Regions:
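Sequence/structural signature of beta-propeller domains
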Residues: 1-212
Length: 212
């Protein structure tokens, strides 16, 4: 048995049974994951040697016959924003992920759901569909100010496909000044469903607010 303590901000994980792979979110690639900071590798064997990426990545891990990962790579990563006009609002470019937090496999379509939990990476946290064969990314949802996406899940009932996800603590962790109606604040959790038939979104059901 072996392990490493070098991972930083390791978040959600999902299993791809068809391809025998794991996909996992690394919210911020830095610290002991880097190869250029020996002080961060004290007490380790420096097995992870990648460049820093504060926008984070989704990692792919290939499993052996014992279901142990033996090879890994960064599947897709966020890209730091260098545009002086927009980087103060979105520290990561908006056509790629920022600080991924949750992942979920869509086995039927060989696609991956990626949900963000970012403060400075994107002004509004996003949910993406990543197409594994082509690498194409499609942004399918965004959240209110100050909230994060969580708990994305895809399930099939009969001929219908459903995706559910949660919008957590709107206006709660940041951007409180943007709040207009108190009822829309972080005291609520927003549950949302997207209904898909034959790869097409045919309707988006309304929000269900549950006060906590």
């Amino acid at each position: 048995m072996g392990c490493t303590t070098e991972f930083n901000k390791w978040e959600g994980i999902t299993y791809d049974a068809a391809n025998k792979k794991l996909y996992t979110a690394i919210s911020s690639v830095e610290g002991a994951m880097e190869n250029s900071h020996p002080s961060n590798d004290k007490g380790t064997e420096n097995r992870i040697r990648v460049g820093k990426n504060s926008c984070g990545c989704v990692m792919e891990m290939v499993l052996d016959y014992k279901f142990s990962p033996f090879r890994s790579r960064m599947l897709t990563c966020g890209i730091p924003n260098t545009d002086p006009l927009t980087k103060a609002v979105d520290a990561c470019v908006t056509d790629h992920i920022a600080n991924p937090d949750n992942v979920a496999m869509i086995s039927r379509f060989n696609q991956l759901i990626i949900g963000e939990d970012t403060v400075t990476g994107h002004q509004n946290d996003l949910i993406w569909i990543f197409d594994l064969p082509t690498g194409a990314m499609t942004r399918i949802a965004s959240t209110p100010y100050g909230s994060e996406t969580t708990s994305p899940y895809w399930f099939t009932v009969g001929d219908w496909d459903y995706m559910s996800y949660v919008i957590q603590h709107p206006y709660g962790e940041s951007d409180q000044a943007m709040l207009i109606e108190a009822a829309n604040s972080g005291i609520c959790v927003f549950f949302c469903w997207i209904v898909v038939v034959e790869m097409q979104v045919v309707c988006a059901l309304g929000e269900l607010r549950v006060h906590i």
